[in-house]
Amino acid sequence: MQERYQPNLVEAAAQQDWQARDAYLVHESAKNADGSEKPKFYACSMLPYPSGKLHMGHVRNYTINDMMARQLRMRGYNVLMPMGWDAFGMPAENAAIKSKVPPAKWTYDNIAYMKKQMKAMGLAIDWSREMCACDPAYYKWNQWLFLKMLEKGIAYRKTQVVNWDPVDQTVLANEQVIDGRGWRSGAPVEKREIPGYYLRITDYADELLDQVKNGLPGWPERVRVMQENWIGKSEGVRLAFPHDIKDENGQLIQDGKLFVFTTRADTVMGVTFCAVAPEHPLATLAARNNPALATFIEQCKLGGTTEAEIATREKEGIPTGLSVKHPLTGQAVDLWVGNYVLMSYGDGAVMGVPAHDERDFAFARKYGLTIRQVIAQEGKTYSDQAWQEWYGDKQTGRTINSGKYDGLSTAEAVDAIAADLNALGLGEKQTTYRLRDWGISRQRYWGTPIPIIHCQDCGPVPVPEQDLPVVLPDDLIPDGSGNPLAKNEAFLSCSCPACGKPARRETDTMDTFVDSSWYFMRYTSPGNDQAMVDKRNDYWMPMDQYIGGIEHAVLHLLYARFWTKVMRDLGMLKFDEPFTRLLCQGMVLNHIYSRRTPQGGIEYFWPEEVENIYDAKGAIVGARLKSDGSEITYGGVGTMSKSKNNGVDPQSLIDTLGADTARLFVMFASPPEQTLEWSDSGVDGANRFLRRLWALAYDRRAAVARGLASGYAWQDAPAPVKDLRRELYGLLKQAEYDYQRIQYNTVVSASMKMLNAIDNAQLPEGPAADAAIAEGLGLLLRVLYPVVPHVTWHIWRDLGYAAELGDLLDAPWPHVDEAALIADEIELMLQVNGKLRGAIRVAAQAAKEDIEKIAVAQEEVARFLEGRPPKRVIVVPGKLVNVVG
């Protein structure tokens, strides 16, 4: 064993050994030495986008996974930890435009570098199962399942309103529309209706909701609530406001009924206006002869269309000059166009009840509309001058100003009004969902081609199964002016599978969330070109532990659950939910430093470029540039980001201090599910600990060799040896518990205490001490191994443990020696008249009378009683003795 710890040599040696013997190659139905089958455990991190380099968030995520995999393997599990690449998507297209290389080359170059980084981290990944979303062998099955969904009616085609950039000739996501303009071209964005494919996730809404509420106990509560809210089940009434408004052809628009959905049918007698979305047919009709309305509608189209954007936007509207009829009274109700009404939600229309809806109240106050109270609460006075929370309460109020419905509770009024609407043919109770069908069509190049052929005679025709995959050309270079597939004749030109005539391929590609909705199952069935998954999937799935960021709580996790249920219904799976347990690791944070530029922008600085300014309490209050001493702004801590120059390059840290240092720091600095604040001093502390571990092993190598060979029996060990063993096994017991709770920071803390205990133990020389050191260091190495596998593997091998117990990768997890935890003596706090005055040591099984005698005989008792005899002695077993006098 070398005297000095050199992480580059230690880590290279360990990794070479692991690679040479395929240490992480996993097979189904692995056996124990006695022939019994090992229990399986599937632990998986959310697959990364190959952006170019790993960041510290990756390091944290994968180290959590790796610790779990290694410790469970020691406990006898057959553990699967795979890895793949979420390789399709816009960043590759944007990089291709900038660098003028095909997205495929950019993507595969990045994968090669990031894979090298992962191996440098020492991750226990079975690379034989690697998948890549842009590999035709993978996305073939996206296309295959899409066709199956099309057959079952789960996939269907309809028109959709999109953000269209007329300069770049492409569709933009809502997030790419900034102040009504394209994020790249700066051109005013247009709203266009184009056809696209959708998946009926709404058919699974009830099952998705029920299981996230009642069937996923291993998921964080906040994620379950987020999914519940996203699905957004609402029970209410869908009712119609009749009208006689006709289009230019004399046809009643939408057959003369304006439908709305409400969860507050009890307030229908308080309706004073209705509002429709800017895209609603009634709005379009009214705008033809109303220039102000037409202008307003165009302005609405420039904004984003997400619910989040609409929720924060100032609520504005304009009257159409049209009216509809109240379904129960027949009175005219003015019709408005509102910028807060979504065409994609419900029927694209809402009823306005200003008295009992805060948004409607503000809208009515702004435009001087009537506010009619129809719900009252005993002892409270209503005023239409300012909103009060009780106006919207539906638990305790009673109806007023509602004719025959007066005096009813909310539930009673809803039932009565729904019954009357139903009798009139103008409404019924209905359950709706916030969840919308999943639109998967993207007018992008770098994605899975949708396997559809367009024929002038036959229309859209599915690609025959035997012709899959429809292969994406991987040599195209986007130029920013639309989808390059639409200009590539070699891809476009084909024959219609139905009639054989010349036809054109679909140029839309699939949403990249399709790729990530089932990749974790492909890991279980690698190399199968005949089926999406096979019987090996039944062995590994459902996944035991999924690990990833909270930002994926809704879309990815919801789509993966939906995809699983579709595969189940197609007879491919035997389970309902893909992920038994979910851990959402916290973000990695670092300090942010910036200043305003003369042009009004913000310039960010790397932490190493500045010196902090501290207040009297040691808190950072500002910073100075090291280069010229000028003061800059300290912005606190925030998520590591390239744009804010506060990221830390894992590769630089690995190259200088080693992967084990990086792993140890990110595991020790914070519990896995909480945010982690970066600390250079914390990194240095982690490295010092590893050097101290190495030094201890080197210094005690001879004692370990003697101890391993001694076969010492512990019953006759001297007291200091027994004390050390008791402390170490107590720490082992705590560490084992913390491993099971995934509280890895306290596992590291226990390891540090174990090191201190061994290093500071005052043991008499001899066989007992040697055996205790050998045993203790062996315990420490096994507890630490999942955290820092390289250095522990090296020490384990060099000190001879491997020869005795086998390679550390498969060394058994140590059992707690319960006998070692039993103390011969215990320490009791000594009190005199209730005040702590010292401590005494007594035999663990000492009788109460013996404890009293030892306590009374102490010098401190005589001194504090000032010669008075004790009146009584109180013994609290195992804790204290109190002499009263």
UniProtKB/Swiss-Prot annotation:
Question: Which keywords does the record carry?
Answer: Aminoacyl-tRNA synthetase, ATP-binding, Cytoplasm, Ligase, Nucleotide-binding, Protein biosynthesis
Q: Where in the cell is it found?
A: Cytoplasm
**Motif placement: 'HIGH' region:** 48-58
Please provide the Gene Ontology terms (biological process) for this protein: leucyl-tRNA aminoacylation
CDD domains for this protein: Anticodon_Ia_Leu_BEm, LeuRS_core
User: Main EC class of this protein?
Assistant: ligase
Kindly list the positions annotated as binding ATP: 642
Q: Where is the motif named 'KMSKS' region mapped on this chain?
A: 639-643
**A Pfam family name for this chain?**
tRNA-synt_1
Q: What is its main location?
A: cytoplasm
- What GO terms fall under cellular component here? cytosol
Q: List the disulfide bonds.
A: none
Q: EC number(s)?
A: 6.1.1.4
A GO molecular function assigned to this protein is: leucine-tRNA ligase activity
Q: Can you state which reaction this protein catalyses?
A: tRNA(Leu) + L-leucine + ATP = L-leucyl-tRNA(Leu) + AMP + diphosphate
S-adenosyl-L-methionine among the record's keywords?
no
Family label: Belongs to the class-I aminoacyl-tRNA synthetase family.
* Name of the protein this chain belongs to: Leucine--tRNA ligase
State the gene name recorded for this protein. leuS
